[in-house]
Amino acid sequence: MTARTFVGLRSVRPRATPPRLIVLHWTGGTGGLARLFDVLRKTTGPRSPDGLSVHYAIASDGTTEQWAPDDLVCLHAGSVNDASLGVEVCSPGFSTGSAWAREKVLGVVREEYEDRIRGRRARMLSYTPAQTLAVTTLVERWCDAHGIPRRVPLEADGLLMRRQMSARELAAYSGVIGHYHCHETKC
């Protein structure tokens, strides 16, 4: 695992309380870690005038880089930044249905599956096997280090929640979530 830090950015700050959430993001593109690092630094908005930040990033081949220490708050998940640790996984997320894109552009075959997120049908691409191992390893380490429960949000029927959680649900929840669970514009 290598380290790269957001030197000089004000997009990280000391953490006042222990994290209780792990937020998984996908990049929505096929670029590598260097490109992602550059994009996050340059992405600004009303809540992130100095760029976005995450604690870790994972490449298609499973390479994992730490971009900020766990004891800092990163800007990656809106209202739950203070309560969370964030990881970006280099993955297109949604599928175009193109076998060429799945195999040639990404350099590895990704499984395509269909699911519902926020009430709409979506064709998704899975993580690579190396990413799955890297994400699992990182999440387990974080759960052990910070006492975060190894769980995901479930609906009353026991199935994975595929919608944004309410502010009340987020405040009461501890565990692993997707970015779409905590942000209205993420799918």
Predicted regions and their residues:
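Short, low-complexity, polybasic intrinsically disordered segments
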Residues: 162-187
